[in-house]
Amino acid sequence: MSLPVETRENYKYFHPIQTRWNDNDIYGHVNNVVYYAYFDTVVNMFMVDNAGFDPHNATAIGICPETHCNYHKPVAYPDRLEAGLRIGRLGNSSVRYEIAIFIYGDEEAAATGYFVHVFVDRVTRKPVTISKPIRCAMEAIVVDAVSSEFAEQ
């Protein structure tokens, strides 16, 4: 089954990513596991840039119980990329970030995926309510689930 390919217009926050030589695998393209590092980068940069999140000192942190990625076309060093970010689901203590990886200048995504965070107390690891500053930042990039590639997942 062929998935519809997401386009830039469906994402609300973008962060540049430069591929590195060691991102490539023996087959000459970015290895599948590296995409998850790209996902983590755009999510955390959004939190730092837009919610004032301090990953080193925050009392609540996001832990990741679930990720997923669909690969649409290969990416390889030295491609310059942009990661697009939106929020597909925002709960009391959890959020599902939806991410697309674009080769710089391309309208269609090379890869799409999602990344779930559950916010927990840094020490106890018990779920906590998403703080107001973080929630406000997240609400600005929430999308209608109907338009999401991952709406049924």
Task: State what each model feature region is.
Residues 1-13, 75-77, 88-153:
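HotDog/MaoC-like acyl-thioester-processing domains
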Residues 2-45, 49, 153:
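Catalytic strand-loop segment that frames the active site of acyl-thioester-processing enzymes
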Residues 16-20, 70, 116:
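Generic structural detector for well-ordered beta-strands
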Residues 21, 25, 58, 123-125:
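Residue-level signal for pocket-adjacent positions within structured domains
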Residues 23, 29-32, 65, 73, ...:
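Generic structural "secondary-structure junction" signal
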Residues 28, 37, 61-62, 108, ...:
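Residues that recognize and position ribonucleotide moieties
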Residues 46-95, 109-110:
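Hydrophobic beta-strand-centered segment that forms part of the acyl-chain substrate-binding groove
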